[in-house]
Every structure is written in structure tokens, then in C-alpha cells.
Amino acid sequence: MLLSTLSIKRAVLAIALITSFGSLSAQQKKAFISGERLNYQVHYGFIRGGEVVLAVRDAIYEGKTVNNLYLNGKTVGLFSSLYLVDDTYQSFTDIQTNWPLKSIRDIHEDRYKHYSTQTFDHWSRSDSSICNSSKTGRVVVVKGCQDILSSVYYLRSIMVDRKPKPDERFIVDTYFTDEKFSLVIRFKGYEKISTEFGKIDCMKFMPEVLTGRVFKSKDDMSIWFSNDNNFIPIKIKFDIFIGSVSCDLIDYQGLLYPLAFKR
């Protein structure tokens, strides 16, 4: 039960949590298009425990065409029978700025259920944005603040043609679970990651995680992104008290640029 709750849920969130450089300015060059879909498997050692899906779709929000970003993470097999996890996150974002307009969190974890929405107003204030939560009401947040899912795609857009320096640190500003959340992440260099498709050139990043109940060290989480203009998450790894958990890309479709790999 502990494994499924921690590893599957954190795999779902890590793709989003550790991938937003909120203080940077968005570029116009795109990194993704509607129709993109990324599929991941979550493993504890050699045991398959979960699945994660990331997708981009078209939608209409307040009469305007927007991106509908979608993330679902769930347990499978034995883990699902022990402790069911089926979490869905959605974000509706402005196509030009990649700023979130509305976010949805729909959580099903065994007997626990949670559904909440947030809407964002980035334009009525010059120095900040406003988030209206269905649970906590109105909150003033950092200008252009991202939700947990939109941060992934915002980062991907601003990382097009960008080459970070070794150990360069970034501060992330998001609003998640009705709390302002700041995260420090570091670029650690370039590595080749073996996948089902072949070896892929990647950029490695590490967030500074909180130690204690789950992590022994602040460097116990790593994520690898494709070193190209797609900048898609290829692999995530967690070193936690009960072992090592990985989340690996197993299928993709609808990428804006070809994904390069060597067999």
C-alpha cells in the first residue's frame, strides 16, 4: 500500500513538479502540438506497478481555442488490487503564452476521492496573477504562475534552443493543492538513456526534495529530458527508503519534431 501510494502518485506528479522554470520568459517557438501523447510505465525494481499518460488536445474555453493538457496516473496489476490509484489532472492553457486559465484535479486513491478546480486571471493586475480555487477562494499569486501540469509544457516551450549551464539553478513558482509552491531544480549535465526505442541523448535535472518520510537525501530524484526541441520527459528515477522507483517512456505519438535515437 505504501509503495503504490508513494511511488505511483509521485511518478504522476514528478513529471509536472520538477519541470517548470517559472521565472523565465516564454518564447514563441513551439515545442508541442495538439495530438501529442506520451505513455510511461512505473516500476519498483523489476515489478510493473503503474502507468502514466500525458496528452495535448484542442478545447474551447470561454469562446477561445486553447490547449487542453491531460495527465492520468494509475496503478495496475497487483498494486491496483492492493491499493487503487487513478488520478487525473487537466489544464486549459493560452496557446500564445502557455499560461494556465483553468486547472482540474480529480483524485481517486482507494477510498479517498477529491475533485477541485482553479481558474487563473493573469491580466487584471500588472504585477501579479489571481487564482480562484473551488476549495479556498481567491489568492494572489506570482505573475504568470503555473499550475502543476501547465508547468511541464511552459518549460518545454522556453527550453527550445536553450542550453543551460552545468549546475545552473532555477526557482519554480506554482500553485498546487491550494498552496503556493516553490521548487529549486538544478541542471546536472548530458547523458544517454537506454529506452525501448534505443539510446536517446538527454539533459539531466535534479530537484531539491524534502528529506524525511520518503527521501533520505535532497538529491534522491532525477529526471531526464530529450536533448532536442521536443524536450519530452524520457525517464524519472526516485531513490526512496523502500527502494528505487522509475518511470520510463514506452510509447509516443504526435511529436512536433522527430525523436532521435540510436539502436
Question: Where are these predicted regions, by residue range?
Answer:
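Bacterial N-terminal signal peptides that target proteins for export
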Residues: M1-V12
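Bacterial N-terminal signal peptides
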Residues: A11-S20
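Single-residue recognition of alpha-helix boundary sites
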Residues: S20-F21, V56
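Sec/Tat signal peptide C-region and signal peptidase I cleavage site
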Residues: G22-A26
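Acidic, serine/threonine-rich low-complexity disordered tracts
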Residues: Q27-H122, D161-R263
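Hydrophobic, well-structured mid-protein blocks that either form specific transmembrane helices
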Residues: S116-M159
